[in-house]
């Protein structure tokens, strides 16, 4: 119950600040604070960014107050590896001494909040989607032996399998749709054909407008 209240309070606070953007005078200032809180520092120059940020310290305090305690108690009843795409459960389980914790990173850009207070002593294994995410994790202090470059976790319906048939066809269609003035293809057609295939780079009649 206490953890549920904690999650509910966090959710209400986030929703309030997000919606407050439309409030005259103070709305943009409040949203600016939230935006600054979630800020990711520039990638370059590559440097050591392992020192905990305010966001990291806040997550650590909330975990000390019981955030994530419920999931830790549940997984201890059947000690299987914990695989999560959200950093808070991973950090909470690691802090509680759970031995096998895997965190799936689904973004190319990630903040310091994905990594616990003391990354060098943590046991969390990170599954990174791209080289940039790998370098971010390194700069946040995660040792190389706990970072695995696995790619983005796309379903087969999106990729089409090992040959990426569906993905290549979809990217080809999107590139043509995003280049109505034919400025991209005269410069980059050779590369597009090489990676996507000639049939996926053909000109097509305009598709009907769809709203999603």
Locations of the language-model features?
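Conserved N-terminal ligand/cofactor-binding loop architecture of enzyme catalytic domains
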Residues: 2-77
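Active-site proximal beta-strand in glycosyltransferases
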Residues: 81-84, 90-109
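Active-site glycine-rich loop that binds ribose-phosphate moieties when present
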Residues: 104-113, 129-131
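A short, charged/proline- and glycine-enriched loop
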Residues: 78-79, 98-99, 205-211
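Short, conserved loop/helix-junction motifs that constitute active-site signature segments
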Residues: 96-98, 117-122, 142
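A nucleotide-sugar donor-handling region in carbohydrate enzymes
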Residues: 123-212
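A conserved, positively charged/aromatic
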Residues: 75, 114-125
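A short acidic (Asp/Glu
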Residues: 93-96, 113-115, 138
